[in-house]
Amino acid sequence: MGSSSFLVLMVSLTLVTLVAAEGVKGGIEKAGVCPADNVRCFKSDPPQCHTDQDCLGERKCCYLHCGFKCVIPVKKLEEGGNKDEDVSGPCPEPGWEAKSPGSSSTGCPQK
């Protein structure tokens, strides 16, 4: 009887801990969606954020370019986004052009 009570107690404590940790990790999600990430990584960068609440202003915590970073989200059409915005991925670095099919640099700052 004692060992079964102990087992029930341990399982209950484990479940409570997991649920509480998930609530802390999730937080409130900010508007918009993370930009597409088409970069292949050989090694992940250390995370700069864990949730949207770690990011200032409207920035979201997104996996981009091999690690979690605070980035400006892409707006969905129903959130006032522009259908001409480039939602195929991040803006190319200066001096590079988008080469993949269907990609463009529309909506990227011109330098």
Curated annotation (Swiss-Prot):
- Which keywords describe this protein according to UniProt? Antibiotic, Antimicrobial, Disulfide bond, Protease inhibitor, Secreted, Serine protease inhibitor, Signal
Q: Which GO terms describe its molecular function?
A: serine-type endopeptidase inhibitor activity
Q: Which Pfam families match?
A: WAP (PF00095)
Q: Give the UniProt subcellular location, in the record's own words.
A: Secreted
Residue ranges annotated as compositionally biased, kind Polar residues, are 101-111
The keyword Glycoprotein is annotated on this UniProt entry: no
Q: What are the residue boundaries of the WAP domain, all occurrences included?
A: 27-74
User: Which processes are annotated in GO (biological process)?
Assistant: defense response to bacterium
Report disulfide bridges, numbered on this chain: 34-62, 41-66, 49-61, 55-70
InterPro entries documented for this protein: Elafin-like_sf, WAP_dom
**What is the first-listed, main subcellular location in coarse terms?**
secreted
The signal peptide, as residue positions, is: 1-23
Tell me where on the tree of life, at the top rank, the source sits.
Eukaryota
Q: Is Disulfide bond one of the keywords UniProt gives this record?
A: yes
CC terms in the record's Gene Ontology section: extracellular region
Q: Where is this region: Disordered?
A: 80-111
Summarizing the function annotation, the protein's role is:
Antibacterial protein. Putative acid-stable proteinase inhibitor.
What name does UniProt use for this protein?
WAP four-disulfide core domain protein 12
Q: Which organism is it from?
A: Chlorocebus aethiops (Green monkey)
